[in-house]
Amino acid sequence: MLTPILATDDPYQAATVFVEAGWSLVFATPRDCGDPLTCVALAGARVMLGTSLPQFLPVQSRAHKGAGIEFHLTVPAADIDAIYQAHSQHADSVTGIAQQPWGERAFHAVLLGYRFLIAADQAEPPPDSGN
């Protein structure tokens, strides 16, 4: 399993943003421990939220945080609409949910400057397929 650690201004507030968008909180270190770190999950995919101190995110790089990277998450097909609705209400920006040219039903969301492509699991029949 690969778990990215994303630089944030406040990992605890960042976790709140993700949880409001439908993710679950896996853990949060104590605020006074000296190592601010949280972890959130969506459909089994985890993302850790760390600090943006200069040793993790140099000041000159802050304007480009998340540039050139998009995280692809596969979620259960039965959950994609609810996940889309939660992200529509709480993400920085969200595209419409649509059938992608490569066959996935998916949407793009930006949370705290990081891009996510959230797609329905193609191994599962769509909720309205009658299977």
Give the role of each language-model region.
Residues 1-5, 24-75, 82-110, 120-131:
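Vicinal oxygen chelate
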Residues 15, 80-81:
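Ser/Thr-Pro-rich, acidic low-complexity intrinsically disordered regions of eukaryotic RNA-binding
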Residues 115-119:
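Short glycine-/small-residue motifs
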Residues 14-20, 87, 113-114:
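Conserved active-site tyrosine of GNAT-family acetyltransferases
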